[in-house]
């Protein structure tokens, strides 16, 4: 599933190609994604211009010059790429936005769990967005915030930091990696984290996500950046996907087990 670094990589990749260039055509090949796409968008978006590309959690927010905002979620397997108009659409290429310069923003989603919505209201108040926690790369997310929020929480810390109401964008890959680097056992109750541990974890989450963004997201499964190129962060994973292999620090076998229906990999020696 594309997480925060993948979505941010996509935003940065497509923004120069889609902002301040009039939309000339919208093609909706399949309108049944996670929620039905408003077919009227194929009629009322052409002639409009996108003026800003933001991100909130895993949602792309594309501001239209008429006050609307397009809310785009990549779902489990989606990607947005800039392609030439001569490139024929594939089986899972569901949406095309063509711009005056001739190039096309193409949405690819084999599993159709993504979303393409429009709102005339403040997107921050949209039902999909209003409950989200702070962005992890902002000053609002820090060790003191984690410490205060975690008090009396019995939830396993890995599940807790993956809760988008606590902080957005810490998906399974990044939760595994961050907890390993912070030397925190993923099954430890969040409420038992010390203040220093919370500060350490917050700093490491920021560093892991920032590094992944710099390297273009991960290469896992279907993700490619807005330029169609894969990311390279997967080449630097310490624990995720390496259950049973030697720990990169102590060489003891890494433990792998399910937690909240997600694969969890950790070192029982380093993360005790």
Curated annotation (Swiss-Prot):
Q: Which GO terms describe its biological process?
A: base-excision repair
Keyword set, alphabetical order = DNA damage, DNA repair, DNA-binding, Glycosidase, Hydrolase, Lyase, Metal-binding, Multifunctional enzyme, Zinc, Zinc-finger
What does the note accompanying the cofactor annotation read? Binds 1 zinc ion per subunit.
List the FPG-type zinc finger ranges.
238-272
Look up keyword Hydrolase and say if it applies.
yes
Q: What CDD domains does the annotation carry?
A: EcFpg-like_N (cd08966)
Which Enzyme Commission numbers does its entry carry? 3.2.2.23, 4.2.99.18
Which cofactor is essential here?
A: Zn(2+)
The active site consists of 2 (schiff-base intermediate with dna), 3 (proton donor), 58 (proton donor), 262 (proton donor)
Question: Could you cite one Gene Ontology molecular function of this protein?
Answer: damaged DNA binding
The UniProt function text for this chain reads: Involved in base excision repair of DNA damaged by oxidation or by mutagenic agents. Acts as a DNA glycosylase that recognizes and removes damaged bases. Has a preference for oxidized purines, such as 7,8-dihydro-8-oxoguanine (8-oxoG). Has AP (apurinic/apyrimidinic) lyase activity and introduces nicks in the DNA strand. Cleaves the DNA backbone by beta-delta elimination to generate a single-strand break at the site of the removed base with both 3'- and 5'-phosphates.
UniProt-recorded name of the protein: Formamidopyrimidine-DNA glycosylase
Originating organism: Teredinibacter turnerae (strain ATCC 39867 / T7901)
């Amino acid at each position: 599933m594309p997480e925060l670094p993948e979505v941010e990589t996509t935003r940065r990749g497509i923004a120069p190609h889609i902002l301040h260039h009039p939309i000339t055509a919208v093609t909706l090949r399949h309108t049944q994604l996670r929620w039905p796409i408003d077919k009227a968008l194929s009629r009322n978006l052409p002639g409009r211009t996108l003026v800003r590309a933001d991100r909130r959690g895993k949602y792309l927010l594309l501001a239209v010059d008429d006050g609307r905002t397009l809310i785009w979620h990549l779902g489990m397997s989606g990607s947005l790429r800039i392609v030439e108009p001569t490139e024929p659409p594939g089986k899972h290429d569901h949406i095309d936005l063509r711009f005056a310069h001739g190039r096309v923003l193409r949405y690819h989603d084999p599993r159709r769990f993504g979303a393409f919505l429009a709102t005339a209201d403040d997107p921050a108040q949209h039902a999909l967005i209003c409950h989200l926690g702070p962005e992890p790369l902002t000053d609002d997310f820090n060790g003191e915030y984690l410490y205060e929020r975690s008090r009396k929480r019995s939830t396993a810390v890995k599940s807790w930091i993956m809760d988008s109401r606590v902080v957005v964008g810490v998906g399974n890959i990044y939760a595994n990696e961050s907890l390993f680097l912070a030397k925190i056992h993923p099954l430890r109750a969040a409420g038992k984290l010390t203040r220093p541990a919370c500060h350490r974890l917050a700093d490491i989450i920021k560093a892991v996500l920032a590094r992944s963004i710099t390297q273009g997201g991960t290469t896992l499964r279907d993700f490619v950046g807005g330029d169609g190129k894969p990311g390279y962060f997967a080449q630097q994973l310490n624990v995720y996907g390496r259950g049973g292999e030697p720990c990169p620090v102590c060489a003891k076998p890494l433990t792998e087990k399910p937690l909240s229906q997600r694969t969890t990999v950790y070192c029982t020696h380093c993360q005790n």
